[in-house]
UniProtKB/Swiss-Prot annotation:
One of its GO terms (molecular function) is adenine binding. This is Adenine phosphoribosyltransferase. It comes from Mycoplasma capricolum subsp. capricolum (strain California kid / ATCC 27343 / NCTC 10154). The gene is apt. It is found in: Cytoplasm. NCBIfam families: apt (TIGR01090), PRK02304.1-5 (NF002636). The keyword Metal-binding does not apply. The keyword Translocase does not apply.
Length: 170
């Protein structure tokens, strides 16, 4: 199945000059959604991981379904002040400024093998922050899966030290 057929380009969203990749038509098609989740789940099973980690918000949509399909733990990565208990915090750079990602300190166990799932790989800033959070937790990222790879925003070999799945490339 060609998942690209279920992604709609929205010009000038969320701001002028941006072409937003809208995945809601994919989520709204039961066959496409099932195919996407099954494909990511098969990748996760091959990695033999302990836990799935994902950032908000759309990463949660994919990763929670994959965690269910693979019977794996699911750990949230969130922006500041969204997690109620003690957290690890990593600052990372955005195009104009910085942001933070956080994870509960006790959610990952030392030596946990982790796969990170997110909807879009753009510059890699969010993913690098998540890798840093996993390392602070003394766990190990072994792979990552992206629904969409915006190849024009990063180097071709970005994250080549990991097993990486990319379902749609632009």
């Amino acid at each position: 199945m060609n998942l690209k057929e279920f992604v709609v380009d929205v010009k000038d969203f969320p701001q002028k000059g941006i072409i937003f990749k809208d995945i809601t038509p994919l989520l709204n098609n039961k066959d496409a959604f099932k195919y996407m989740i099954d494909t990511i789940a098969e990748f996760v099973k091959q990695l033999d991981v302990d836990v799935i980690v994902a950032p908000e918000a759309r990463g949660f949509l994919l990763a929670s379904a994959v965690a269910y399909a693979t019977n794996k733990r699911f750990v949230l990565v969130r922006k500041p002040n969204k997690l109620p208990r003690e957290v690890y915090d990593v600052e990372y750079s955005l195009e104009y400024g910085t942001n933070h990602q956080q994870i509960h300190k006790e959610d990952l166990k030392p030596n946990d093998k982790v796969v990170v799932i997110d909807d879009v790989l753009a510059t890699g800033g969010t993913m690098q922050a998540i890798i840093d959070l996993v390392k602070l937790s003394k766990a190990e990222v072994v792979g990552m899966s992206f629904l969409i790879d915006l190849t024009f925003l990063h180097k071709e070999d970005l994250f080549s030290e990991y097993q990486v799945q990319k379902l749609i490339k632009y």
